[in-house]
Curated annotation (Swiss-Prot):
Enzyme Commission number(s): 2.8.1.4
Catalytic residues of the enzyme: 456 (cysteine persulfide intermediate)
Span of domain Rhodanese: 404-482
Pathway(s) where this gene product acts: Cofactor biosynthesis; thiamine diphosphate biosynthesis
GO molecular function term, any single one: tRNA binding
UniProt keyword ATP-binding, yes or no: yes
Name of the featured protein: tRNA sulfurtransferase
Catalytic class of the enzyme: transferase
Coiled coil: none
Localization of this protein: Cytoplasm
Name of the coding gene: thiI
Annotated S-S bridges: 344-456
Annotated family: Belongs to the ThiI family.
Length: 482
């Protein structure tokens, strides 16, 4: 298999040195991602494109899925590559590939060249198009809106016949910009905000302030792992979990009710800045949107920002909620967010919408900052690549099996799209489909005399859900890995 990678246009207009650096970074990113499943993948750098090749055609679908999610790629062409001698040879090769597919259809030929040739791109289009029109049973040439568009790329002595064009993610290659630390809660906003900076070329590390116990942390890890695994797996990033319950308890006891929301956000920014300093990260990212909740007025955001010199980036600051939800659906975090509890907004009954810095600072004089220092010092740092391994260790008491028994039901917990695309069929066994985001509420209604085997494609989600169900007191659960 072979693909031609078309660069995001902003890369191509950079100066020569910057463009070459960005392309080289993208080359490494693609190589890192593809070699997670295909050791034979090769990535060759050219002036305005990259060429990906592998002898392992069985990984074609995985490669297409991976390339579509790598920042910096505008589009990628699936091609058949060969050498050619002259125009007629090009025609013969194109006819062998496309001839049978033109029956009863209009078509046109589009060619792009790079290098020195005795013919122009237009001459290629005319010669190949005219030859196909004469030798194939088609409905003729139509230059505008044809039924079939045949794309050719000629680079030196190489001919690339394009069989499919796939849309890329666009954006900048990861690591062309500086690192950021995203304050992730698992909700709609923070996941989308994190994605925006992945797409813009930043390594996005994650900082989670735990207000809801182990189940909440498991859910947020799922979101962070999903974002990394789908869009950012070319680079190592960290997931930091900070137990913020002692901080909330201190706020509830010492801070005036109306000021609690702003004070809590200021404490989070202080803690996040300390975490960022630990890893020399210059900026923080939040999913805040102006006016969405009481703490997100311009006045309050200004007061919140005063606690740190770090740049606080808010990519969703003007987004409407329906647009955020739509983007969450597109990037695959919607289903996580729909079942994620929100804790931050419930601690103030009458929150201020116009905080005064002097009053906030006066309230904070009652706060014991040793508590904040302690929770940051005790924060847990995790290489996000190890989330799956850590989960496996945490659920070691949950049996993993490749077989199913007579009194066992296989539960396919993948999303609806994944289930519909590749339904799980096990001969002679009952298979039920309950998406992971409905499992928490639906599991208690299932017959308790049966044992349920949780299945997902990679085994990470099933292990996380098994741990959660175990914590809820359900013993009749296993992980299914056929």
């Amino acid at each position: 298999m072979k693909f031609i990678i078309k660069l995001f246009p902003e890369i191509t207009i950079k100066s020569k040195s910057v463009r070459q650096r960005f392309i080289k970074i993208l080359q490494g990113n693609i190589r890192n991602v593809l070699r997670r499943f295909d050791d034979d993948a090769r990535v060759r750098m050219d002036w305005d494109k990259l060429i990906v090749s592998s002898r392992n055609d069985q990984f074609r679908e995985q490669a297409i899925e991976a390339l579509a999610c790598i920042p910096g790629i505008q589009a990628f062409l699936e091609v058949q590559a060969s050498k050619f001698t002259d125009l007629h040879d090009i025609f013969e090769q194109v006819k062998a590939v496309w001839g049978d597919q033109l029956e009863g259809k209009t078509f046109c030929v589009r060619a792009k060249r790079h290098g020195k040739h005795e013919f122009s791109s237009l001459e290629v289009e005319r010669y190949v198009g005219g030859g196909l029109n004469q030798h194939c049973v088609s409905n003729g040439v139509r230059l505008k809106n044809p039924d079939v568009k045949i794309n050719l790329e000629i680079d030196g002595e190489e001919l690339f016949i394009v069989s499919a064009i796939h849309q890329g993610l666009s954006g900048m290659p990861i690591a062309t910009q500086e690192d950021v630390l995203s304050l992730i809660s698992g909700g709609f906003d923070s996941g989308v905000a994190s994605f925006q900076f992945i797409k813009r070329g930043c390594r996005v590390h994650y900082c989670f302030f735990n207000l809801g116990g182990a189940a909440h942390e498991i859910g947020v890890k799922q979101v962070a792992y999903h974002l990394w695994n789908r869009f950012g797996s070319s680079h190592r990033v960290r997931f930091t979990a900070v137990d913020f319950e002692p901080v909330v308890a201190e706020i509830l006891e010492k801070i005036d009710n109306g000021q609690m929301g702003v004070v809590l956000k200021r404490m989070m920014m202080r803690a996040a800045a300390k975490v960022a300093d630990e890893f020399q990260i210059p900026a923080l990212v939040t999913g805040e949107c102006v006016g969405q909740v009481s703490s997100q007025t311009l006045t309050n955001l200004n007061v919140i920002d005063r606690v740190t010199d770090k740049v606080i980036l808010r990519p969703l600051i003007t987004w409407d909620k329906p647009d955020i939800i739509s983007e969450a659906r597109r990037i695959g975090t919607l289903e996580f967010a729909e079942t994620m509890p929100e804790y931050c907004g419930v601690i103030s009954k009458k929150p201020t919408v116009k905080a005064e810095l002097s009053r906030i600072e006066a309230e904070e004089e009652n706060f014991d900052f040793a508590i904040l220092d302690k929770v940051v010092a005790e924060a847990r740092y995790l290489d996000i690549r190890r989330i799956g391994e850590e989960t496996a260790a945490e659920v070691q008491e949950v049996e993993t099996t490749a077989e199913s028994g007579d009194n066992e039901v296989i539960l396919d917990i993948r999303s609806m799209d994944e289930h519909n695309e590749k339904p799980l069929l096990v001969e002679g066994r009952e298979v039920m489909h309950i998406p992971f985001f409905k499992l928490t509420t639906a599991f208690g209604d299932l017959p308790k005399e049966k044992t349920y085997l949780l299945y997902c494609d990679r085994g990470v989600m099933s292990k996380l859900q098994a741990l959660y169900l175990k914590e809820k007191g359900f013993a009749n659960v296993k992980v299914y890995r056929p």
